[in-house]
A protein has these predicted regions:
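Metal-dependent phosphoester-hydrolase catalytic domains
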Residues: 16, 201-212, 220-343
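Structured beta-strand-rich core segments of catalytic domains in phosphoester-bond hydrolases
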Residues: 85, 91-171
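Extracytoplasmic/secreted cell-surface and envelope-processing proteins
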Residues: 34-35, 95-98, 122-125, 183-186, ...
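A long, amphipathic alpha-helix that forms part
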Residues: 186-208
Length: 343
């Protein structure tokens, strides 16, 4: 069954009504590289002779670890089903994705992927994993990051992987992002936010009923100007206007102090999934006749957290301080759950 009977205590609805539930996730893969050089890319650190001594053993373990975590995403709510879609960042190429979806936990569910090779100098791209039993892709486009200043004409970074398709019988769009790094400065992430907003607005102009989700590692918090002002991702459902988006992660960071990556002992929440207004129940409504947002989750399984040492309590990353930890990622995964009443 790809549905869940949601009882009174969850949604305060008729306990005998059936609702289909869909998990949509995002997970930064933290340098999911193979062991081979890609021409024109600065991937030398992730070669057997590179600084990380990235050999077959480490690569094989990385694939196994990431597949485990990806397959577990969403299973708290949807056991044995997991997420319908998962956006990825920091994947090197299609070879890596072929190897990833061939891992038993993902292969058992038949996950496929969407990927377009991008211009990032390190060779890291975004991708979208999807379960073809739940999501049917229709269009795919990598919208480029367009530098705005003459001095940045040679600035090559990740574009915005834009995928449309059907989920739960409805037209949806997913924009998977990995915005410029913190080292670049906030200006470049605000440029990215403006460009993503333009993509989102264009989709809604062309298809007014389409439901749009922007997801990714934004390298900014929900409270940052790029997210809160430029993308206009609001903290409260009832604050969201027709040109805005809803950011369910805002209060998780601002009020609860929880996040997806740790820096100098404090949490940031760079990994976000934000939603268009037509995915919300506003002003106290409980109308699930079409796909609507239900709740969100930062995935914190024990095996994803460093249990000892200097980095205790932080995400268990692949390497730290030059030491291979056989971990997962320096980021935690995130999931939003969407609900639709079964007809």
């Amino acid at each position: 069954m790809l549905s869940l009977l949601l009882v009174l205590g969850l949604l305060r609805l008729n306990a005998q009504t059936n609702y289909s539930v869909y998990g949509v996730g995002f997970y930064n893969q933290e340098n999911l590289f193979d062991t081979c050089h890609d021409k024109g890319k600065n991937d030398y650190d992730f070669l057997p002779t590179g600084s990380y001594k990235w050999d077959k053993l480490k690569y094989t373990n990385k694939l196994r670890n990431m597949a485990r975590a990806l397959a577990d995403m969403g299973t708290d709510v949807l056991p044995k089903v997991g997420c319908a879609m998962i956006g990825l960042s920091e994947v090197e190429n299609a070879r890596v994705l072929d190897a990833l979806v061939a891992q038993p936990p993902l292969a058992a569910r038949g996950y496929r992927y969407i990927h377009v090779e991008g211009p990032d100098r390190r060779g890291i791209d975004c991708a979208l994993l999807y379960n073809p039993q739940l999501f049917t892709p229709q269009t795919v486009k990598l919208v480029p990051y367009v530098p705005q200043l003459p001095k940045d004409s040679a600035f090559h970074t990740r574009g915005y992987l834009t995928v449309t398709g059907t989920l739960g019988g409805e037209h949806v769009a997913v924009i998977v992002c990995h915005w410029p790094s913190r080292y670049s400065g906030s200006y470049y992430r605000e440029v990215a936010a403006a460009q993503v907003k333009a993509v989102k607005d264009s989709l809604l102009r062309q298809h007014p009923a389409i439901k749009v989700m922007v997801m990714g590692d934004m390298n900014d918090d929900p409270t940052s100007r790029s997210m809160a002002k430029v993308l206009s991702a609001k903290a409260e459902v009832d604050e969201v206007g027709k040109d805005d988006m809803y950011n369910p992660w805002y209060n998780i960071l601002a009020k609860q102090g929880r996040g997806t990556l740790m820096y100098q002992g404090g949490w940031n929440l760079f990994d976000q999934i934000v939603l268009s207004p037509n995915m919300l129940n506003q002003n106290g409504k409980r109308d699930f006749s079409s796909l609507k947002y239900w709740k969100c989750q930062i995935v914190r399984y024990d095996y994803l957290i460093q249990s000892t040492g200097k980095y205790k309590g932080a995400p268990k990353r692949t390497t730290a301080g030059g030491v291979w930890l056989n971990g997962y990622s320096d980021h935690l995964p995130v999931v939003v759950y969407l609900v639709k009443k079964q007809s």
